[in-house]
């Protein structure tokens, strides 16, 4: 594949380095760079010590990147050192930008107006405390802030884009930062790529690996496509990047996957199972009955805006008594088959369907562990039922690997795919 412009990302913040705060900026920036056709060379995370930040900048430059993007360390406190370090690294003096200071002051006034606990008389001291955020490397370009921390672009080889840490402040200014002349100059050598995402469920990674090896041998020009695979929530996400002149190679690859793996390939346009289920539920009303997942499926269904149009309600029936009282499950059924059984899952779904007056119901009952398993029903045994008011039903028992959290999360994925298949009229296991 052709060599493109390359970038490196430096995430700063001791709270991110130590895991107290999850890095959401690195993956987001990486996706935006890839969309632009910019190759991502490295993502690094470092603490707030100036020497560590400068070491990361130097490392990126040594790797030959054209653009460095930093996030974090732009606040007014003593440990916010990114701008000072970038200025020193770029050999530029720190100067006060009067216009920027006034813009920050206006933002502070608005924030103070929303907080009656702050005395107006204290504004001058607050402005002085935030003056640090108006100190910029000489010759840099300011990106207007959403909060009080502006973005900065420092020209050079490599160019340095300095962005705030909070995603709600970083993401809105990205498009302006990327359009600045220094950044456009830095990424001028980028290559135009297409990126396609295929999602697969119910296929072992080893089977996909076998198919890709066969594709490499059978499809001319296979080396023109770049494939990455990721196992997430029990699904395989396969992302393929290629230049437009390799489109035919990708078409042959997608056809091979479709021919070999049939319904296991459930999305060729990147749509998630959550998106597909939401579309299939249009005009319907669903109710859920959950035991071991304790509402995680309902949470996943309602995570999408507009879900109130198709989600009727949910019941978490953890104990046997709750299954009987809330869902009408016959205690004799539980006594005969156990709470984790297909008959009980079917009864739970029927109870949810009737109790909420829904036309679609999904039930989950299982053993998430770490205790509670038996030789006949080990930890990871989970029973599912999807029931529609026209009589269509799908019931499955699976054994899921992993710890308690893994089993619960994967259970919601299995349930979503059973729901997708049942609503789509697709036969067979998920």
From Swiss-Prot:
Entries under Pfam families matching the protein: CinA (PF02464), MoCF_biosynth (PF00994)
Domain of life: Bacteria
GO cellular component assignments: plasma membrane
CDD domains named among the record's database cross-references: cinA
InterPro entries from the UniProt entry: CinA (IPR050101), CinA-like_C (IPR036653), CinA_C (IPR008136), Competence-induced_CinA (IPR008135), MoaB/Mog-like_dom_sf (IPR036425), MoaB/Mog_dom (IPR001453)
NCBIfam families reported for this sequence: cinA_nterm, PncC_domain, PRK00549.1
Family: Belongs to the CinA family.
PANTHER family on file: NICOTINAMIDE-NUCLEOTIDE AMIDOHYDROLASE PNCC, NMN AMIDOHYDROLASE-LIKE PROTEIN YFAY
Name assigned to this protein: CinA-like protein
Encoding gene per record: cinA
